[in-house]
Amino acid sequence: MHCPQSARKTRQQQQHPLTDRCAYAGSANMPSAVAIPAPLPPSNCEEGIWLSKSVLMSLLFPNQALPAAHQVSSVETPSTSTTSTSTTTSTSRAASEFDANYCNTVRNPYIPPTPEDKFPVTPPPSLDQTAMSSPAACIPHESGPVRPKQTVAFTPGFSNPYPAFIEQSSVSMPVYEPTPHLHTQPQTQSRPSTQTPHQHQQQPYTFATPPYQPYDHIYSPELDLSLLSTDFSLYPQHPQHPQIPPPDLSLWSPSIDAASPLAASSPDPTTLWAPAIPIAPPQPASKQDGPIPRCWDHGCNGRRFSSIGNLVRHIKEQNGPRARFECRRCGQTFTRSTARSMHVKRGRCEGTMRSKGIGGK
């Protein structure tokens, strides 16, 4: 006796002979600890493929975000030359032509890591994976329209199993604009007031009582009390404290008593501000500078001499110095030997003149 439920399952397997192979191919290389979802009916076959791929991608690439269900491309299985595989392929093509929800086979190109390995086996980095690691590529485009499926044939040495998904996501990639950090914002926004400290200082001070009221007894009675009622709010640039008395202007008045100790101790302003004249050091007198040597004694009447030495010699001669050099021919005395020699050479010697017959004596 045949059960109606078993007959229904047999009929479904005949119509879709690759449904069991799809579930087996998706779970062949997965660890035993991962729960494999049960095969789904043909209406939900596309969602089942996306769920199995998401489980495999979460195991192989734990740090990458998963794509949306409509962005995963389907994969076709290569056919063999045997009769059984050709029959199965023709049956699957016929089923895919008449059934829009037909489930294609899924095959994992990578081997998952085993517990004996120290490090997980990951594919080499590529430019496509670098693009997937960007924040904009990880955002799933669930709100956009569903794109048609694209068939991709995998090669054994290719590092990225989903190039079509990356190309689709790079075309419709949104512009990623990072928000400014809190530390980069200007600090002027945290101030409660918009005025600068300098503007706070320039605000006028208003007093309820007239200033300098507790110091009225210090000043003389001749002081006009109307000055105390001056409106100081008209001078905002120079605020004054009410407890500081004004300076005594009598010290700066021009009428100062000469007998006051301040006037007596103050020095003469002309002596303080007189320019200092530089004093040049004494220089030795030259022959051209100074008075001309003259002799006013011995009846010379101011005779001039070319040098001071000649004047001294003249004085010694007039005062009767002792004769040291005497001419042998005429007996004339001289104070210097040079004068005696010059006396002979110039022909002034009387004895020489006599010998030559020049003189009359």
UniProtKB/Swiss-Prot annotation:
<feature type="zinc finger region" description="C2H2-type; degenerate">
    <location>
        <begin position="325"/>
        <end position="345"/>
    </location>
</feature>
<keyword id="KW-0862">Zinc</keyword>
<keyword id="KW-0863">Zinc-finger</keyword>
<dbReference type="GO" id="GO:0006417">
    <property type="term" value="P:regulation of translation"/>
</dbReference>
<dbReference type="GO" id="GO:0008270">
    <property type="term" value="F:zinc ion binding"/>
</dbReference>
<keyword id="KW-0479">Metal-binding</keyword>
<comment type="function">
    <text>C2H2-type zinc-finger transcription factor; part of the gene cluster that mediates the biosynthesis of the antifungal antibiotic FR901469, an inhibitor of beta-1,3-glucansynthase, exerting antifungal activity against the pathogenes Candida albicans and Aspergillus fumigatus. FR901469 is a cyclic depsipeptide containing 12 amino acid residues and a fatty acid chain. Positively regulates the expression of the FR901469 biosynthesis cluster genes frbA, frbB, frbC, frbG, frbH and frbI.</text>
</comment>
<feature type="region of interest" description="Disordered">
    <location>
        <begin position="70"/>
        <end position="94"/>
    </location>
</feature>
<protein>
    <recommendedName>
        <fullName>C2H2-type zinc-finger transcription factor frbF</fullName>
    </recommendedName>
</protein>
<feature type="region of interest" description="Disordered">
    <location>
        <begin position="175"/>
        <end position="211"/>
    </location>
</feature>
<keyword id="KW-0539">Nucleus</keyword>
<keyword id="KW-0810">Translation regulation</keyword>
<dbReference type="GO" id="GO:0005634">
    <property type="term" value="C:nucleus"/>
</dbReference>
<feature type="compositionally biased region" description="Low complexity">
    <location>
        <begin position="73"/>
        <end position="92"/>
    </location>
</feature>
<dbReference type="InterPro" id="IPR013087">
    <property type="entry name" value="Znf_C2H2_type"/>
</dbReference>
<comment type="similarity">
    <text>Belongs to the GLI C2H2-type zinc-finger protein family.</text>
</comment>
<feature type="compositionally biased region" description="Low complexity">
    <location>
        <begin position="183"/>
        <end position="204"/>
    </location>
</feature>
